[in-house]
């Protein structure tokens, strides 16, 4: 089977980590708001998560992500970047290396 792309995602059920959802439901009942750490970048953001701060691991450290209503339906990993762009090298430095 080939790549189905974004079209197929509309028909698939969203993946939500049960442990994470259980913690959020418990915090919603008590009215508590504390940072929840998770390594699960593939977890889909649901309406229950709105208003919570979830620290998502990016491979080096946990990045706190405050969940807003516009984020519902996206993945947690989309808001925790894994790569840092340090810029392109200067042309003068490149010319010196060639000599």
Swiss-Prot record:
Gene Ontology cellular component list: cytoplasm; small ribosomal subunit
GO MF term set: rRNA binding; structural constituent of ribosome
Alphabetical list of InterPro entries matching this protein: Ribosomal_uS19, Ribosomal_uS19_bac-type, Ribosomal_uS19_CS, Ribosomal_uS19_SF
PROSITE patterns: RIBOSOMAL_S19 (PS00323)
Pfam families: Ribosomal_S19
The keyword rRNA-binding is annotated on this UniProt entry: yes
Keyword Transit peptide: no
Segment forming the signal sequence: none
Disulfide bond entries: none
Listed HAMAP family: Ribosomal_uS19
NCBIfam families with a match to the protein in the record: rpsS_bact
UniProt function note: Protein S19 forms a complex with S13 that binds strongly to the 16S ribosomal RNA.
Family: Belongs to the universal ribosomal protein uS19 family.
Protein known as: Small ribosomal subunit protein uS19
Species this chain originates from: Persephonella marina (strain DSM 14350 / EX-H1)
Taxon lineage: Bacteria, Pseudomonadati, Aquificota, Aquificia, Aquificales
Chain's gene name: rpsS
